[in-house]
């Protein structure tokens, strides 16, 4: 079986490396995705990636994917998007939620997630390494299911 993971990055993550590096780090999104592609290929897993500042594009990607697992950093949509939650529940694909910063150590409005209670797991506060942790977990879960 050919395993596939969909990696979703929400609004403003295209600015990684430039936007508040003290909070989000110095790596660009392209650098992070390149590392994850290497990790996925080494495990024999296909990684599909989308980043968008538009909620509907992320929803359409969720609806259209044939991936067996999703890793999502919803960014600001974490705290606002019932639509993303409904899209994820609608396709019934297990997902991990990732945040670069520790959202619980930040402003109170960032403490609530519309996705966390439905995620397999939530990884936050590890910077870009959080994506690697999520991909490792996703690969293990996919491989154990076959």
From Swiss-Prot:
This is 3-dehydroquinate dehydratase. Its EC number is 4.2.1.10. Signal peptide: none annotated. CDD domains: DHQase_II (cd00466). The keyword Amino-acid biosynthesis applies. It comes from Shewanella oneidensis (strain ATCC 700550 / JCM 31522 / CIP 106686 / LMG 19005 / NCIMB 14063 / MR-1). The active site is at 24 (proton acceptor), 99 (proton donor). Pfam families: DHquinase_II. Homododecamer. SUPFAM superfamilies: Type II 3-dehydroquinate dehydratase. HAMAP family: AroQ. Keywords: Amino-acid biosynthesis, Aromatic amino acid biosynthesis, Lyase. Catalyzes a trans-dehydration via an enolate intermediate.
